Structure formats: structure tokens, C-alpha cells
Amino acid sequence: MRFSLNLLTLALLSATGAVTAADFGIQHANTAKVKQAAYQCKQCKIPAVHTGSVTASLGYVDSSDSHAGNAFGTNDEGVVAGVDANVSYLNAEGYRSQLQAHQLGMDNGFVSARSGKIGEYKVELDYRNITTWQDEAQTQLWHHGGMLTPSESVRFVDLKLERQQAGLGFEYQINEDLNTYVRYDREDKTGSKSASLMSPRPINFAQPVDESTDKLSAGVVLSGANWMTDISYHGSQYKNNINHMSLPYAYDVYAATPDNQAHQLAVAGQYRLDATVLNGRVVAGRMIQDDNLIQVAGNPLQNWDGQVDTLDAKLAATSMLTPRLRVGGSVDYSKRDNDSSVYEFMQPRLSYDPLSNSFKQNTVLDIERQTVKLNTAYRLAQGYRLQAGYDYKQVERSYGEREQTRDNTLWAELDIRKFDTVRFEIKASHGIRGGSAYEASELTSSEEQSLLRKFNLADRNRTELELGTQYTPANWMSLDLTVHYAIDSFDERKGDDTVLGLHESRDYGYDLNLNLFLSDNLTAYGFAGQQWIDSEQAGDQANIWYADINDSFINLGAGVAYSGLLDDRLTVGADYLFANSNGETLVDANLTGSTSYGDYYSFNHSVELYGEYALSESMQLKLAYQYERFYDTDASEVGVDAITGLTTLGLGNHNYNAHQLMLSFSYIL
């Protein structure tokens, strides 16, 4: 019989002494004199690994409306191309890199790269292009160098915004308890959007957009066995590259968005003590705006010396008192202190109060919030868990219509997991908002309608219910259903509540998701969701009027995929999506008759058919066809000169069919 013993084993055996008294536990082995480096496994080195895939796509788009670019990723007609990638690299020394890209080269795409050594450092680089299309506008105002020049010829402009975002970040781990990071981001936004001015009659025009935002974040993270602290700085600077706009016969008729900057210092941390976890944060910030102002008669200011200081603090705790009982709570405080300069305006038409016969100064507005949340969870029995909580929020506003509001909310949730195939979640909450006396704001006008209540400040009762269930009768089927209902009532509980304004609002709907794994080769899914929002409000324009506003939304979708064709090389599939939204407003004036105010209506059909064919283990072809049918109409939009004295950008409604055919080649690493 042959015995094969390596040198390390022989050394361990020789160090044990007499066989009769030996303890062969590895913890007693004496390896001090063993040259372990000479006996390392030469075949145990982990090789460098590349995983992922790279895809190049070439296609053709046929569309008569630029709005289709929101679905296809580009509004370019004709031939389009893009690159997708998801590649990772890892070697034995701990170096890791990752590259991700999606529709790179198209109007909506991104690329992201990460590289570094595990436990030491990481560098990240990101670029993203985001383009959104609204509609095509027609205008007779031409913009150049800050001047809006009227012209007899009509100019067609795409109302679209393009955002180019780039970021660079670096993380360095000094040791296992100390980590540092810094990141810089920049966004450039260009394009056109809808705007309005009076000159002397109302005119809608395509406002040019050319602005940039720079952001910088840096911080240090310290950690221990049961604690962690993050000390960081966050800053941003906004710059508008388009100044005030003028007409040939009137200067500075449209004020530009002012340049501004913001800075924050933050300290956040977490501490764990047995079954209790504490976490909190303190953030101090300052926002500054000191851009030039448009000069008008009676205005003594050349620029606005604006400054707002902010303070945010939060402390939260959660504790497992027993294996069945968990309790938690948080206290949140925020303050917005407006320290902008205060000036006295001597021009009567700007500052004169006809009731008090006095001149006034501009008033700075402050706001302060306190929020307290308490919650608990208790396991009633195996498979039954009850959660409940109380939320309190108080908001104080200076010089507002209502200086103080208080929200009190009680909520509860029952989670049932007793059964193998079905799970239930039942949630309910009830909230009441009250506060100080509601008075007309001195800043807005002391003659304001005393019966008018703004919905975000008025007394309100809110009740909300939600029921969710997950049903899995077999391993090839799963069904999720969620139903919700909420009602906001602005009733007259104290005789000082809403008479004019929003009276009541109901929000209810459902969401249904179905997943089917019919066989190893066949899968399917479907979903449906609907939402209804019904509101009642009243107003006063010569006569009291009442309005019912009904908004409804629906989303339907289904898909199927089958693999295993042509020797398991071919997979085919289809996806369908339908979306519809409808808004109706019915006005009843003095109960003398009802009038439709005008509706908004839109629907969208989207279909995708595709086939994927594996040329080999590392190469794959995909052919996909996508179709979109989109239609919308908005009664609030009118033609350019349909209303005397009003110039619009034309009808922006959509009604189009769009097609995209795309061939993709993928290489799998």
C-alpha cells in the first residue's frame, strides 16, 4: 500500500511528540518552522474573469411626430444606431471594473464606468443624455442675443429639453474604519419651452433654454464595530446663460431665471446597542441669490441680496424589546430662515397700502416644521403581524394666510402570512388637520375673500384604506392585487372652513399583476391598473359656481416569450401596452344649468415583436419591431389667433403612428 504525505503534513506529525499523548487538533499544530511559502498551491490562483455582453444596434425609424422620440429614444427619422454594454472584470488581486451602456449614440442614452480595487479605492465616470419632446410650436417671435424680434413669417420650433449630465467620483478607503469620497457632477440643459408675456396683450412664445448646474459632494465616513458617522459637504451652483429678454420697442419684458448657489454641511450617524439602533442627522445649509434685477421706476435695487439659511435635524430609534415586539420613533425638525435684505419701496404704485395709508417694505417669509412619528410592530401569532403608529406634523409660516397648521394621523397595518399560497396586507389610516385662525394674508390683500380656503392650508379629514394580496397557488403562477381608496374632506367642522375652494376629493383604484411560467420554454405576464380621482370645488366670479372634476387613468399590458425553437437557438416574444387618461370638468353656476368646461383625453398603444437567435455560445442576433399609436387632445389649447387679443403657440395635440425596426448583434463574453 502506498502512502502519499507532503512535507507540511510530515512537519505537523513530527511536532506532535509521543503518539499516545498526541492531540491532533489543528489548533495545536506548531508551524513556526515550516516554510509555508514554498508549498503554496500553484494551481489555486483565481484567474482574471470577464463577464457580460456588448451589443451594437442598427435600425430605421418612421415617424411624423417628434413626440415618438420619448418611446424610441430618438426622434431622428431614417437610419439610427446605438450601443449597449454590460461588462465586468475581476482578477485575483481584487481589481474590479464594470462598464454599462444603454442606447449610447441616441438622444436618450447613458454610459457608466467603475474601476478600482476592493477595499482600497474606486473611480467612477458617468455620462447621460436625456431628451424629452413635448410638441411642435409655431411662433412669429425670433430670439437672438436676448432680443425677441417679431416676424411675418412663421417659425416652427420643437418644444424639447435636452439634458447632458456628466459626473466623476472617487472613493478611497484609508483603512477599514476610515473611508473618504468626492464627486463632481455637471448638467447642461438646452432647448425650448413654452412661456408667456404681456406686450401689451398676452403672447405665448418659445422661450430658449441654455443653463448649467454644477454640483460637488465630498465627505468622510468613520465606522467602528457598532457605529458609523458620515461628515459631508454638498454644494451646487446654477447659471442661466440667457439674460433678460427684450422686444424691439420695449426692453427687459421677460425676466430671466436668476443665477443662484446652495451649500450644505451635514453630519449623519448610526449606533447599534444590542437590539436597539439609533440614527440621526444634522444639516446646515445656505442658499444665495444675488443676480441683477430688471430696473423699473421706483425700484432702488440694482441686484437682489437674497439669502436663506436652512437647518434640518432628525433623530430616529428602533428597538426589539422582545422577539415579538418592536417599537420605534423619530423626531424631525426643519427651519427655513429668510435673511434676505429688506428695503423700503417709495413708489406708491408698488408699495402703497390704501387701507392703512402707509408705505411698506418687502417682507421675508420663514417656515418651520416639526414632525414626530411613533410606530410599533407586534407578532400576534405565527404568520400574523400587527403594526400601528401615530404621526404628528406642525408647520409655522410667517406672514401667511394661516400661520400654523397641525396634522395628526393614526395608522395600522395587519400582515397575514399564515397560509402557504396566499398573503394579505390590510392598511388603514385617518388624519385630521387643523390649526390657527385662517385670515387673509396682509401680503396678498386684506380684501381677500374671507370664505376662500387654500386646500393645502384648510382644515381637512383624510381617510385611507389599502388591501393587498399575493396569491401563489403553484410554482408556475403568481398573482398580486392591490386596491386602495382615500377621501379628503374639507368640511365645516368649526364654521370657519372651506366655503370657496376644494370641498372634497376621492382617490381610488387597483393594480393587478400576473406572472405565468407555463413550461421550461414558455412564460407570460399581464398587468392592469386603474385610478380615479374625483374632486368637488366651488368658486366665486360674480356668481357662486360649483365644479365636479373627474380624472381617470388606465394601464394594461401583456407579454409572452417562447424559447427552444430551432435546436434551442431561437426565442420569440411579444409585448403590448395600452395607456389611457381622461379629464372631465363639469361646471354648475347657481344651479341654472351645467356646462362642460372642456376635457383632456389621450391614449397610447405600444407593441413590440422580437426574435433572438443564438449564432453560437458567444454571439446572438436580435430583430425587433416596435409600433406606437398616440393620440391626445386638450380643450385648453387653441389656435394661434382663435381668441381675439391672445397669441398662442398653436394646437399642440398629437395624433400619429410611429414604427421602429432594429437589428442588434450581441457578443457574450
Name every feature range the model reports, one short phrase each:
Residues 22-46, 59-669:
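Gram-negative and organellar
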Residues 1-22:
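Gram-negative bacterial Sec-dependent N-terminal signal peptides
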